[in-house]
Amino acid sequence: MTLIHMNVLMAFSMSLVGLLMYRSHLMSALLCLEGMMLSLFVLAALTILNSHFTLANMMPIILLVFAAYVAAIGLALLVMVSNTYGTDYVQSLNLLQC
């Protein structure tokens, strides 16, 4: 395993740890999820470049498109929650509190 692959896997694991530690705010959870998607994109692109598998060249681009789509939905959810509740705490999204 090369040093670049180790760095990308470390970035993914740091984003995962950040998601587990800072899950009280919706904005920090979205940022950690975006970091995970970016590291997956880089890992997929590096793997395809190293293996010379030309049939899978579209996979990182499709992953990036889905990441942008999920980020747009997450930001729309963040705006809706902050306008409705006045805060971005994940605890305010609990439907059982009513």
Swiss-Prot record:
Keywords: Electron transport, Membrane, Mitochondrion, Mitochondrion inner membrane, NAD, Respiratory chain, Translocase, Transmembrane, Transmembrane helix, Transport, Ubiquinone. Coiled coil: none annotated. InterPro entries: NADH_UbQ_OxRdtase_chain4L/K, NUOK/Mnh_C1-like. Pfam families: Oxidored_q2 (PF00420). It comes from the Eukaryota. It catalyses: a ubiquinone + NADH + 5 H(+)(in) = a ubiquinol + NAD(+) + 4 H(+)(out). One of its GO terms (cellular component) is mitochondrial inner membrane. It is found in: Mitochondrion inner membrane. Its main location: mitochondrion. It is a multi-pass membrane protein. The chain crosses the membrane at residues 1-21, 29-49, 61-81. Gene3D superfamilies: 1.10.287.3510. GO terms for molecular function: NADH dehydrogenase (ubiquinone) activity. It is an enzyme of class 7 (translocase). Its EC number is 7.1.1.2. GO terms for biological process: ATP synthesis coupled electron transport. Core subunit of respiratory chain NADH dehydrogenase (Complex I) which is composed of 45 different subunits. Belongs to the complex I subunit 4L family. Core subunit of the mitochondrial membrane respiratory chain NADH dehydrogenase (Complex I) which catalyzes electron transfer from NADH through the respiratory chain, using ubiquinone as an electron acceptor. Part of the enzyme membrane arm which is embedded in the lipid bilayer and involved in proton translocation. This is NADH-ubiquinone oxidoreductase chain 4L. It comes from Balaenoptera musculus (Blue whale).
